[in-house]
UniProtKB/Swiss-Prot annotation:
Region (Disordered): 82-110
Name under which the protein is recorded: Small ribosomal subunit protein bS16
Family annotation (PANTHER family): 30S RIBOSOMAL PROTEIN S16, SMALL RIBOSOMAL SUBUNIT PROTEIN BS16M
MF GO annotations: structural constituent of ribosome
NCBIfam families for this protein: S16
Keywords carried by this UniProt record: Ribonucleoprotein, Ribosomal protein
Length: 110
């Protein structure tokens, strides 16, 4: 059973609240879950302490069992100092080739 720690949406229309849950990855986003680990309210100010509440002992226990956090939960855990988030691989894109650079320089000179 591949377990993932992710956000499950709750709340009403236009006023989302998310539960941080440990769930089987095959279950729907808002469907059945194994255990609730905390909650997240994105509408609160970022400096408010109640914006994100996590039971860190439960989260650490699930990580020890092999649960994988989702991207957003991985950001939360990195900010809390629980698990270091791996940096994204952002390859260098759209670097002009040498010939194009030479053509651009020649065009700029003339």
């Amino acid at each position: 059973m591949p377990v993932v720690i992710r956000l499950a949406r709750a709340g009403t229309k236009k006023r989302p609240v998310y539960h941080v849950v440990a769930a089987d990855s095959r279950y729907p986003r808002d469907g059945r879950f194994i255990e609730r680990l905390g909650h997240f309210n994105p509408l609160m100010p970022k400096d408010n302490a109640d914006r994100l509440k996590l039971d860190l002992d439960k989260v650490k226990a699930w990580l020890a069992k092999g649960a994988q956090p989702s991207d957003r939960v991985a950001r939360f855990l990195d900010a809390a100092g629980v698990k270091k988030r791996t940096p994204r691989n952002n390859p260098v894109k759209a670097v002009p080739r040498k010939e194009r650079k030479a053509q651009a320089e020649a065009a700029a000179k003339s």
